UniProtKB/Swiss-Prot annotation:
The lineage of its organism: Bacteria, Pseudomonadati, Pseudomonadota, Gammaproteobacteria, Enterobacterales. L-methionine binds at E56, Q99, D239, K270. It holds the Pfam family S-AdoMet_synt_N. GO terms for biological process: one-carbon metabolic process; S-adenosylmethionine biosynthetic process. This is S-adenosylmethionine synthase. Catalyzes the formation of S-adenosylmethionine (AdoMet) from methionine and ATP. The overall synthetic reaction is composed of two sequential steps, AdoMet formation and the subsequent tripolyphosphate hydrolysis which occurs prior to release of AdoMet from the enzyme. Residues 99-109 are annotated as: Flexible loop. CDD domains: S-AdoMet_synt (cd18079). It catalyses: L-methionine + ATP + H2O = S-adenosyl-L-methionine + phosphate + diphosphate.
Length: 385
């Protein structure tokens, strides 16, 4: 097979869609602190000078949505009208309703283990051994670039940076393995008086070089840094932002399939979120155990029904034991019923705001990134002999 090129992108916490995701998840976290059993589906819209927070929330908690919104915007860095958005002066509108009782009766049960899925749908999880975090290289390094931009901005190393930024990396693959970087694209919002030459040099020296391993780079690697030559108007002034519009950035950068459901603003009774996390947990432990080099899992559910309607496993010919044996180990060691996976991954804690920028996967601070079952899986697969 000839060389193939594969591209993934990421966006910073100051991107309009990511602002919306972070506000939705900040509201969710604030509610879970008081009421872990709350039902939350929180959507956010941001545009110049305005934030609208809406959705369906059923809870005994009271949270100050306006204060949460302003604090989130300030933490991201939108604190002055010069940036086109100011946390302190923007309008914040709330339009919150309650979850339908028709859904409640399908989800809530006397025995928690019988808790039904909050909706139908299919979710995917994926892992690959091509990076240290068992994630695809293109999305991993795309995330790290925009995360580095945020760090340089917040510590004042590059004080002319502004919150909105995007990255995109094209990797060259040979026989399914990443071998080199073909192209790096990086665009960052900046103050008006910064020259293109000054910006290009700073981005290369302070953002790209510290993040990208030299073994991926060569004299033929192409760089496009702020290729339009100007990125002063950005954030919500440049584009409106909506919760749930960056689902490929949130997951595997297009390297794996996606069921279509967004994550942010949803409590873990919504399998769009919790089952996608569980699928990643299963796939990562399979790869960490050495049962396969690459692994993709699909799980599907019916609303109000506890047990998955299907589980699919794809290892792309990299499996070290039979697919049937791996499937047997999944059924034996992973409870993929809605309550089972919530308990397995301890998902009722207020951990979601941190997921809403720089990827839900590939960062070890999250419980679904643990590889605590890998040794057991390896032993029962007979690979320790």
């Amino acid at each position: 097979m000839p060389h193939q090129l594969f591209t993934s992108e990421s966006v910073s916490e100051g991107h309009p869609d990511k602002i919306a995701d972070q506000i939705s998840d900040a509201v969710l976290d604030a509610i879970l602190i008081q009421d872990p059993k709350a039902r939350v589906a929180c959507e956010t819209y941001v545009k110049t000078g305005m934030v609208i927070v809406g959705g369906e929330i059923t809870t005994s908690a009271w949270v100050d949505i306006e204060e949460i919104t302003r604090c989130t915007l300030a933490e991201i860095g939108y604190v002055h009208s010069d940036m086109g958005f100011d946390a302190h002066s923007c309008a914040v509108l709330s339009a919150i309703g309650k979850q339908s009782p028709d859904i409640n009766q399908g989800v809530d049960r006397i025995d928690p283990l019988d808790q039904g899925a909050g909706d139908q749908g299919m979710m995917f999880g994926y892992a690959t051994n091509e990076t240290d975090v068992l994630m695809p290289a293109p999305i991993t390094y795309s995330h790290r670039l925009v995360k580095r931009q945020s760090e340089m901005r917040k510590i004042g190393q590059l004080p002319w940076l502004r919150p909105d930024a995007k990255s995109q990396i094209t990797f060259k693959y040979d026989k399914g393995y990443a071998v080199a970087i073909d192209t790096i694209v990086f665009s960052t919002q900046h103050e008006e008086d910064v020259t293109q030459k000054q910006l290009e040099e700073a981005v290369m020296e302070e953002i790209i070089k510290p993040v990208i391993p030299t073994q991926w780079l060569s004299s033929s690697t192409k760089y496009f840094i702020n290729p339009t030559g100007r990125f002063v108007i950005g954030g919500p002034m440049g584009d409106c932002g909506l919760t749930g519009r960056k689902i490929i950035v949130d997951t595997y950068g297009g390297m794996a399939r996606h069921g279509g459901g967004a994550f942010s603003g949803k409590d873990p009774s919504k399998v769009d979120r919790s089952a996608a996390y569980a699928a990643r947990y299963v796939a990562k432990n399979i790869v960490a155990a050495g049962l396969a080099d690459r692994c993709e899992i699909q799980i599907s559910y019916a609303i109000g029904v506890a047990n998955p309607t299907s589980i699919m496993l794809e290892t792309f010919g990299t499996e070290k034991i039979t697919i049937q044996k791996i499937m047997s180990l999944i059924h034996q060691h992973f409870d993929l019923r809605p309550y089972g996976l919530i308990k397995m991954l301890d998902l009722l804690k207020p951990i979601y705001r941190a997921t809403a920028a720089y990827g839900h996967f590939g960062r070890d601070v999250f419980p679904w990134e643990a590889t605590d079952k890998a040794e057991l899986l390896r032993e029962q697969a007979g690979l320790n002999q």
